[in-house]
């Protein structure tokens, strides 16, 4: 099974850094970056507002534990948002490419 991983970062440069490391290590097959968004969230008892970047990764579900550990090592946040969305179905050609890309 395959997964989309949703991560928020402090900005585009951090998203690029994480994406490149995970691609080089073949933990992910593909990374998409949405360079800028606004986030509102609770932190230490008050509502915060920050500019962030979105990093979307595509990988096999069995790589998730490794991916989470690695992102936590690299990420600048104390508690990074790392969420998995299972891919239930998709283009067979794309999923084959994804699998082949993870093999190296």
PLM features per residue range, with description:
Residues 1-104:
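Positively charged, small/polar-rich N-terminal and surface patches that mediate targeting and assembly
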């Amino acid at each position: 099974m395959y997964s989309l991983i949703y991560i928020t970062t402090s900005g585009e440069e951090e998203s690029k850094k994480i994406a490149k490391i995970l691609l080089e290590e073949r933990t992910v097959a593909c990374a998409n970056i949405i360079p800028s968004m606004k986030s509102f969230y609770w932190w230490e008892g008050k509502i915060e507002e920050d500019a962030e970047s979105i990093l979307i990764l595509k990988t096999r579900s069995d790589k998730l534990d490794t991916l989470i550990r690695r992102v936590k090592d690299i990420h600048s946040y104390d508690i990074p948002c790392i969420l998995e969305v299972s891919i239930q179905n998709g283009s067979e050609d794309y999923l084959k490419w994804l699998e082949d890309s993870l093999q190296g």
